[in-house]
Amino acid sequence: MGSKRRNLSCSERHQKLVDENYCKKLHVQALKNVNSQIRNQMVQNENDNRVQRKQFLRLLQNEQFELDMEEAIQKAEENKRLKELQLKQEEKLAMELAKLKHESLKDEKMRQQVRENSIELRELEKKLKAAYMNKERAAQIAEKDAIKYEQMKRDAEIAKTMMEEHKRIIKEENAAEDKRNKAKAQYYLDLEKQLEEQEKKKQEAYEQLLKEKLMIDEIVRKIYEEDQLEKQQKLEKMNAMRRYIEEFQKEQALWRKKKREEMEEENRKIIEFANMQQQREEDRMAKVQENEEKRLQLQNALTQKLEEMLRQREDLEQVRQELYQEEQAEIYKSKLKEEAEKKLRKQKEMKQDFEEQMALKELVLQAAKEEEENFRKTMLAKFAEDDRIELMNAQKQRMKQLEHRRAVEKLIEERRQQFLADKQRELEEWQLQQRRQGFINAIIEEERLKLLKEHATNLLGYLPKGVFKKEDDIDLLGEEFRKVYQQRSEICEEK
């Protein structure tokens, strides 16, 4: 029973293990199924999400496409509107530019006509041309004077060069003369030295001769002592020797005297040469001084001549300017006189015209009154004839006559209004003409100032009188021009 129980237990355990393994397998299988379901569900969810995402993206793309299309349409409409606006602006700008160009051409044409027809501008251009001619003439005179000055300067330089060359030659000659004098002096010194050496040699020879004489005397004495027999011969020999010595001494004295005389003559010649050299040097210095004075005189003469020429040129230019200014002043005076006479004549003509106009106005008014009166009578008569007033009773006659007078007065008032309208139109035309004349005068003034600004600076100092109408013209040309113009005016007044 015990073994059976043990066997059962083993079977049970085995069965239990089998059951447990089976349960585990079932559990694993269930887990696998669950995992598979979960994976499938996740895949399904992911597919659904992908589809939803694609649908959402497609929806967004459609909305973005619609927005882009709408924006493109709006942008195209805006571009079209901007192009139309730009086209209108360009057309407006082109019209304005054409208008400005037309006005500019019209203004330029009018200015050209004013320039061509303005007497004042033509006179100013003539004066400016005359100033340019004066400037050119002054430049030519200055150029001629400059050429003369350069010629005189070259002549002065040539004279200076010749003087320097002359001085150099004199200096070289003096240097050569000094060199020769030094050579002569050295020669005389060498000669004197040779003479001294010769004198010294002769003195030494003389001393040697004396020594020999003493020796001879000693020998003679010894010979006299030794050989009495030969005494006479020796004495004669001694006498001969003495005579020789005496003759030698005489000759030496004569030679010394001659040499002294020669030395004195040489010294005299040297002194004469030195005096002559000094005199020559003094003559040379005097000649140099004379040449220097001549050069200075020539230079002063050239300078004075140049100054005289410059002064004559300035005087001539001043005379020309004064003559030109006087001529221009006379022209200006005659012009002022003509303008005054013209103005006076114009005033007289205007006065006469005014009187004639007043008289004519009186006549016109009188004629108008007479015409109105005649017109009134005529119209009243016409109305009366048309309406047969005489056939009416008194009340109707008065009413009809009053009606006729009113009609006539209305016609007369209409004629008056027409007359006033005509006069108003004439006044407006006259005012327009005055404005046009004022505009023309402004153009003339602008062109005049333009000409002055363009040419006055280049013609400063050559402008004739009458170019500037007022002081403001000078101020308009700048501070520097005004200062230079005032300085030149002060210089002309001082002259």
Curated annotation (Swiss-Prot):
Tissue note: Expressed in nasal respiratory epithelium and in the sperm.
InterPro entries listed in its UniProt record: MNS1, TPH_dom
Record flagged with keyword Nucleus: yes
Keywords annotated in UniProt: Cell projection, Cilium, Coiled coil, Cytoplasm, Cytoskeleton, Disease variant, Flagellum, Heterotaxy, Meiosis, Nucleus, Phosphoprotein
Family stated for the protein in its record: Belongs to the MNS1 family.
Keyword Phosphoprotein: yes
Highest taxon above the source species: Eukaryota
GO annotation, biological process: cilium organization; flagellated sperm motility; left/right axis specification; meiotic cell cycle; positive regulation of cilium assembly; sperm axoneme assembly
GO cellular component assignments: axonemal A tubule inner sheath; axonemal microtubule; axoneme; ciliary basal body; cilium; cytosol; intermediate filament; motile cilium
Region (Interaction with BBOF1): 1-314
Protein name: Meiosis-specific nuclear structural protein 1
Transmembrane segments: none
Gene that produces this protein: MNS1
Disease connection: Heterotaxy, visceral, 9, autosomal, with male infertility: A form of visceral heterotaxy, a complex disorder due to disruption of the normal left-right asymmetry of the thoracoabdominal organs. Visceral heterotaxy or situs ambiguus results in randomization of the placement of visceral organs, including the heart, lungs, liver, spleen, and stomach. The organs are oriented randomly with respect to the left-right axis and with respect to one another. It can be associated with a variety of congenital defects including cardiac malformations.
Protein species of origin: Homo sapiens (Human)
Functional description taken from the UniProt entry: Microtubule inner protein (MIP) part of the dynein-decorated doublet microtubules (DMTs) in cilia axoneme, which is required for motile cilia beating. May play a role in the control of meiotic division and germ cell differentiation through regulation of pairing and recombination during meiosis. Required for sperm flagella assembly. May play a role in the assembly and function of the outer dynein arm-docking complex (ODA-DC). ODA-DC mediates outer dynein arms (ODA) binding onto the axonemal doublet microtubules.
Residues recorded as bearing Phosphotyrosine in the entry: 188
Primary site of residence: nucleus
